[in-house]
Structure formats: C-alpha cells, structure tokens
C-alpha cells in the first residue's frame, strides 16, 4: 500500500505558520493513506512536557493528531530510520518532511519527498 508519511518537523512547521499539513496532503494526495510513526507521537509528547513556544506547538500538534483519522505505526524505532525504512518498503509512498537533512537523505535514495511551505503548499 502507498502512504504519505508525515514527519514531526512538517507537523510543527504547519502549526507555527497556521497551515494544516494534513489538509494539504488530503487535497494533493486524496488517494493515499496518511501515516505517522509512534515515534512522532513520542517526540511530540517529550517536547510538550517542556515550556516555551515549541512546547506549546507540540501540545497543539498532539491535540490535532488525536482527532485525525491517521494510521499510526507502532514501531518505536528512531523516527528518521523508520521513515526511511517504511518509505523504501512501500512502493509509491512519499514523505512530507521539513527536516533538511532527512529531506536530502530521502531524495538521494530516490524516495519522493516534499516540504510544507509557509503558504501551505507541498513542494
């Protein structure tokens, strides 16, 4: 099955700029199931336990994720490794990430990868 795999960085980027990464994905790729890893939830929970702007963004992200109909993969490995492995094993999947290092790594392996822009577009 093909998925749109969404990374923590894109979720937080969307919140920071009042853009809904899930809506953008749905509009551009309605035929693909959205997928995140348990590790994304763990990263957000860890961030949310702190104070400051990033913690507030993480809390907002968690509230949003709890109301979305997303598939959550229960593997608890490091998120970037999970994304690379999952995208490699599922043909025609693509990844949404605003993490520059991960973006370049995925692209170098031939995996379709997009970033969420400040305007809410996937590029």
Task: State each model region's role.
Residues 40-123:
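Nuclease catalytic cores that cleave nucleic-acid phosphodiester bonds
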Residues 1-67:
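Domain-level signal for Mg2+-assisted phosphodiester chemistry and nucleotide/NA-binding surfaces
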